[in-house]
Amino acid sequence: MLFYTLPTISLASVEEIEIVILESFPVQVQVIARGNLPDPCTEISEVLQEREGETFFTTIKTYRSPGFCIQVLAPFEEIIPLDVYCLPAGTYTVDVNGVQATFDLEVDNILSI
């Protein structure tokens, strides 16, 4: 066991991401991020997302309260919807805490009225 005297905020250790394109129109895209937290006392505290050009940058932050905790990895899975509405057709990159994957939008993702 380790004892922490201050809260700890850090990035989640993401091991893999999976991109899921839902069969709908407009298309919906989700990223499933999987990894391990350093202990069961650490939790996902915040998921931030921004897009620069054709790249989605997603940051998963963790929070750990001060105190004792057993030192054993705690797996996590976080499902993150991407804001892909109104995007033109093309290839896009997703980066979640440094782990990257790509997906293709076959057509412009705009609902015509």
Stretches with model-predicted labels:
Residues 1-113:
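Exposed, flexible binding/inhibitory loops of compact, secreted disulfide-stabilized domains
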